[in-house]
């Protein structure tokens, strides 16, 4: 979620230190990826998703943002599982806001969980569930247009 109320009531924490930590990490050159567990009815409104996307873009449009489906577990057994349509909507909002690397997780969605070149649109890393296939010869470089793809590429 992107409100102090959500962080306090659902996470038992405060939002401000999380945001400050992200700002510090990005400012000092640490590679950062962010995962948000989307809880339907808690932190999945268009306004909240848009606010989160704008904050991340303000740090860098290249920060990968993983929008992850939730399911009933542990202390939230009454939680409704995050619908695929909710993830797809959040993904679209994040892309509209200018984030270049947005992914959905905890669902099977090859298109929205794979990595594409933000310049030419070429598929670079295909993800099918837990299977990952790199489709480039030089990690971090699009073979279609030569665009550098930010990240920590170890294969």
Regions found by a protein language model. Give the residues of each.
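Auxiliary Fe-S-binding modules of radical SAM enzymes
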Residues: 46-155
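Conserved AdoMet/S-adenosylmethionine-binding subsite of the radical SAM
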Residues: 1-82
